[in-house]
Amino acid sequence: MVICCAAVNCSNRQGKGEKRAVSFHRFPLKDSKRLIQWLKAVQRDNWTPTKYSFLCSEHFTKDSFSKRLEDQHRLLKPTAVPSIFHLSEKKRGAGGHGHARRKTTAAMRGHTSAETGKGTIGSSLSSSDNLMAKPESRKLKRASPQDDAAPKVTPGAVSQEQGQSLEKTPGDDPAAPLARGQEEAQASATEADHQKASSSTDAEGADKSGISMDDFTPPGSGACKFIGSLHSYSFSSKHTRERPSVPREPMDRKRLKREMEPRCSGNSVAQSPPSSSLTATPQKASQSPSAPPTDVTPKPAAEAVQSEHSDASPMSINEVILSASGACKLIDSLHSYCFSARQNKSQVCCLREQVEKKNGELKSLRQKVSRSDSQVRKLREKLDELRRASLPYLPYLSGLLPPSHEPPKLNPVVEPLSWMLGTWLSDPPGVGTFPTLQPFQYLEEVHISHVGQPMLNFSFNSFHPETHKPMHRECGFIRLKPDTNKVAFVSAQNTGIVEVEEGEVNGQELCVSSHSVSRISFAKEPHVEQITRKFRLNSEGKLEQTVSMATTTQPMTQHLHITYKKVTP
């Protein structure tokens, strides 16, 4: 999978540039506060980041990264928040408005050419239509951003065309005013059709100022559509309501006369037929010699078109914008509320997903706990059964479970051996040596108990120290002759040896040696001939055992030594 940047209009992806030139960083999904800050900075609608969402390092300032070596991967600080997004947005906005202006200019050129074509109906009306069409076409060419390549018309050429048109239309012709009236009616009808077509086009696409409704209306938002309509109302409603109900045709003729008279003032030919409608408009104050010169600075096509439609109104577009500034501020605040509400909705959705995930994990943990409780309940039932059975071969259960009845009293005969009672574990591991064996270590567990009889029960169970596999095992009884210190040690081993050892107990020390040794017929050689044992309770309360033995090939030699610590009484 190729890692890409999740920012809008960012084309950075893994492997696109030089190595380590751009790094990618995951969204902090586990930190809810920091995740909300990242989402506010990215400003993506109806989008929720996942564990595969990244932002490239170009959206973070230099102080957002921790100081590391050059060959190490860049690491964000725990408080880093992306903040660099405005450059790409400005470039996108500039390109979009330029396209709108070019589109508006091209559309107005097409309408002007169509109007000029409709005006040339007959030979008697051609010269008058030239006077109506050429100022407008020249005005549009001057307002177009591509006016450098457009041909320019000089005032001399205009005056020459005016003279030719006046020569072709004699002033003493009684039908001339009627022809001019019909021509003006046709021109006004054509212009009305043009206004209807342009208004329908503006309703579908961009308005007169070159700003599209899509700039204020995010998709799928009824509140934003309403706010966008308020925007269009704030720019056009007041201007439309204050526009006078004067017919469009006289205003166009006045504007045409105002533009044509300064250009024709330098010409020596001054023709003013009393029957011509072109001389019926008095000169305005702006055309006086003391008035400032007309601003001929090239303007965008959208402003040129808007100025044509707003010359008849006492308010200019700047005055309209100034009068609507308060409304625009209110509408901008509504816009910010609308977008912030949508961002809050996306944040709530993200937090809701995290809560649902945590609830799922909690549910699985509860299921595991319930299963564990059922297992513990079953184990307790089994232990209760064992306790009720009071099995004699499980003496260690008396230390784990509360007794079902009172433990048996120690027989007074075995009182001198009471220091050996309990469960003992090797600490540290025991050591084994013999001339015919490799030295080794082992773990051992010892159980010495009684059931009220004049004897002790014992079992020795040894294990490997690493694998914990069972090794040597033996069990048996320790008997004490009444009113003496003479002791008999009877044991059976898993190696096939059965022995009887006898000795004496002196305080907390017991020494016994083999009295008879028996073995199975297929026991391993060399056979054991004699065994001695010594048990002692040291000053630390630990039990020590030392075992020596003699075989058919070796004399009496120490074989085992181990120390036990008591774990249960």
Curated annotation (Swiss-Prot):
Names of required cofactors: heme b
Q: Give the GO terms filed under biological process for this record.
A: nitrate metabolic process; tyrosine metabolic process
Zinc fingers (THAP-type) span which residues? 1-85
Gene3D superfamilies reported in the protein's UniProt record: 2.40.128.20, THAP domain
UniProt protein name? Peroxynitrite isomerase THAP4
Compositional bias (Low complexity) spans? 280-289
Q: Where in the cell is it found?
A: Cytoplasm; Nucleus
What is the organism lineage in this UniProt record?
Eukaryota, Metazoa, Chordata, Craniata, Vertebrata
Q: Which residues does the annotated region (Disordered) include?
A: 88-216, 235-312
Source domain of life is Eukaryota
**Pathway, per record:** Nitrogen metabolism
Q: How does it assemble?
A: Homodimer.
Motif (HCFC1-binding motif (HBM)) spans which residues? 230-233
Q: Where is the composition biased (Basic and acidic residues)?
A: 242-262
Q: Specify the enzyme's EC class, one word.
A: isomerase
Gene Ontology, cellular component aspect:
cytosol; nucleoplasm
